[in-house]
Amino acid sequence: LGTREPEVYGRATLADLEREVRSEASSLGVDLTWFQTNHEGAFVEAVQALRGQADGALVNAAAFTHTSLAIRDAFLAVKVPFVEVHLSNIFAREPDRRHSRLADLAVGVIAGFGPAGYGLGLRALVARLGER
């Protein structure tokens, strides 16, 4: 992140993004656990670990968004509310990237706002959790 296709994903690094999300979480008074992986199995295990440990999740499944039934099944099993976030507008990209296997399970989807989408997603998730 920060170097791959900056015209699509921007120049913010993963560390920049984490710092911004942690700052937003602090201002909202919520605890945050940060997790990143490039491995589908590790992603599934992280989702499964949410049960009983988290009230909600902010998720960017990257390319797994379009392909992973395993991650979808993990979210179906844990029933933890989540917001799906994407740096780019996946719905305006090439056809293979326009379909999300997670969107219908998410409480909402935020796409195309770059790093700001994470703060938007976190605020929306906290608001939704406050309605329960």
Language model region names:
Residues 1-28:
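Glycine-rich phosphate/diphosphate-binding loop of Rossmann-like nucleotide-binding domains
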Residues 31-41:
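Short beta->alpha junction loops
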Residues 33-34, 92-132:
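Short, glycine-/small-residue-rich phosphate/pyrophosphate-handling segment
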Residues 42-46:
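Short acidic active-site motifs
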Residues 50-57:
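Short acidic/histidine-rich motifs immediately flanking catalytic phosphotransfer sites
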Residues 62-65, 88-90:
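Short glycine-rich anion-binding loops that position phosphate/pyrophosphate groups of nucleotides
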Residues 68-77:
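Short Gly/Thr/Asp-enriched flexible loops that form oxyanion-binding sites at enzyme active sites
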Residues 76-93:
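Short, acidic/small-residue loops that bind anionic groups at enzyme active sites
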